[in-house]
Amino acid sequence: MSSWYDAWADRYGDWSTGVTADVPFYVGLARDADGPLVELAVGNGRVAIPVAQATGRRVIGIDSSPAMLAQARVRAVEEGVELDLREGDIRELEIKEPAALIYCPGRSLLHLPTWADRRRCFERVAASLRSNGRFAWNAFAFDHHLASAIDGQHADTPLPHTNYYSVGDNRVDST
């Protein structure tokens, strides 16, 4: 999975600049959290940096892409915030101190290839949270009407991947 993100890392910053609608939600959760903050699929720090700025606290960021983590490190220094950035697979999350908040913005959980992968991620998150900790993520609501209009191969995306929408199978694949 990381090779695709490594290849896209240089363009992600430009694309993500205007993607901010979810940031206040995660900032609010982080302000209410009393303990460690962990962002899964931290990417270039799009959400982690504003969370760290708003809370004045360090955010642990996990990502499988070295190129994205390198961008997050540069951006964190530029913004004067502390991020503890770690290369890793969110399906194998391990942190020493249980977290008060673990969050995964940007529909990143949907990038895990199988339901078993998502389940494994949820299991690791549950094992990594404090007893009163929270896990927050977002996902899109599948729209059958929209998908049926573009059912089959959709190859005109600006990124090097293909989306496949199959209404009959109730699935959306990104490869």
What does each model-found stretch correspond to?
Residues 1-43:
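Conserved class I S-adenosyl-L-methionine
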Residues 48-92:
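Class I SAM-dependent methyltransferase SAM/SAH-binding core
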Residues 110-112:
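A short His-aromatic
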Residues 119-131:
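A short glycine-rich, Lys/Arg-flanked "PGG" loop and its adjoining helix->strand segment in the class I
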Residues 136-175:
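SAM-dependent methyltransferase
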